[in-house]
Design a protein with these regions (language model features):
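Histidine-anchored nucleotide/phosphate-binding helix
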Residues: 7-22, 26, 138-147
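Glycine-rich nucleotide/cofactor/substrate-binding loop typically near the N-terminus or early
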Residues: 18, 24-88
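A glycine-rich helix N-cap at a beta->alpha junction
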Residues: 45-69, 188-217
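Internal, conserved structured core segments that host functional sites
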Residues: 81-148
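Short, glycine-rich nucleotide/cofactor-binding loops
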Residues: 1-8, 130-131
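Cap/lid and interdomain-hinge subdomains that line or gate substrate/regulatory clefts
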Residues: 59-99, 105, 153-162, 166-173
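Conserved phosphate- and dinucleotide-binding cores of soluble alpha/beta proteins
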Residues: 122-167, 172-189
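C-terminal accessory domains and tails appended to enzymatic cores
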Residues: 218-308
Length: 308
């Protein structure tokens, strides 16, 4: 669901699909962390250079795809690493437009299911967790997933609405240093109470190798924390230059799969809040109205500070 290094976590989870004999295509959001791209916020399609259009909200990159400022996207680096195309999503026009774009891309690629994966578990946040730092992107993308799940993403090929399967996933609970492992577990019990939890999968040695190899091409800390958990490490590890701390536990080696539509009634309040938004800014304002500060606020504050 995120940008930056989240695509590495998605690659780790793809190992499950390999074991099931299922073909897959990776994707991610055109939004790099501020140390990589100092310009705040995600990039729109008009701000992406390279790649080929794939639906109305994405481009397919095979490498060398950058912002207009020359910043190469993590998804582009992943495509070069894998030697296969990766999808790059524009989330700036809000959940409904993104859902249509994802449905169009899924049809073009021949995908009959979409898995929206969050690294860390902040997509399940309530908004009052002390460590929560990046709720906006995840909430907006999962809100697009709700449109998909409800058949509300209409395309030229599917005028009655796209009818593929839609799953949510949390990879490496607590591994981004935002929600603690205990907080993520509390949110998982909310999924269970809503009959929304579908299953759990643990990182295999092969999946760990995939993540470690990809992380040499695509900078990431959170996705690698899950590997360290799977390798049996324990303890507290600082990330983000010491601004966050990850507690390495067995929980971090797991990926939880859930039904977003079933969760929408009670377990994903931030996603529900941004669902009506017609743009990224409206989604941001919806969370701000709940008293939830987002990654966009943090990036804008950093950018303003660098220009003072």
């Amino acid at each position: 669901m995120g940008g930056g290094g989240d695509v590495v976590g998605a690659l780790g989870a793809s190992n499950l699909l390999d074991d099931l004999g299922t073909e897959w295509t990776l994707g991610g959001v055109a939004w790099e962390r501020s140390p990589i791209d100092p310009r705040p916020g995600p990039r729109s399609l008009e701000e992406i250079r390279g790649g080929r259009p794939c639906g109305s909200a994405a481009v397919m990159t095979e490498g060398g795809t950058t912002s207009l400022d020359g910043v190469e996207f993590s998804e582009s680096k992943m495509a070069s690493h894998l030697g296969r195309p990766v999808l790059l999503l524009d989330i700036t026009r809000g959940p409904a437009a993104l859902a249509t774009g994802i449905a169009e891309a899924a049809e073009e690629l021949g995908c009959d299911a979409v898995v929206l994966l969050d690294v860390g578990g902040d997509v399940l946040a309530h908004g009052d967790e002390p460590g929560l730092a990046s709720p906006l992107c995840d909430a907006l993308v999962l809100a697009a997933g709700l449109f998909l799940a409800r058949g509300a993403a209409r395309t030229a090929a599917s005028p009655e609405g796209w009818r593929g399967d839609l799953l949510g996933a949390v990879y490496g609970p607590g591994c981004d240093g935002e929600l603690t492992p205990d907080e993520v577990l509390e949110r998982i019990t909310e999924l269970q109470a809503a009959d929304a939890l579908l299953g759990t999968w643990g990182l295999t040695p092969e999946a760990c190798d995939l993540v470690e190899s990809a992380a040499r091409a695509v900078p990431t800390e959170a996705s690698l924390m899950a590997v360290r958990c799977a390798r049996g490490e324990r303890g507290s590890v600082p990330i983000r230059s010491g601004r966050r701390t990850v507690e390495l536990t067995p929980l971090g080696a797991l990926t939880f799969f859930f039904d977003p539509a079933a969760a929408a009634g009670s377990a994903i309040p931030l996603t529900t809040a941004v669902s009506p938004a017609a743009s990224l800014e409206e989604a941001h304002d919806a969370l701000m109205g709940m008293g939830v500060r987002t990654e966009l606020d943090l990036e804008r504050a950093r950018a303003a500070g660098s220009h003072e």
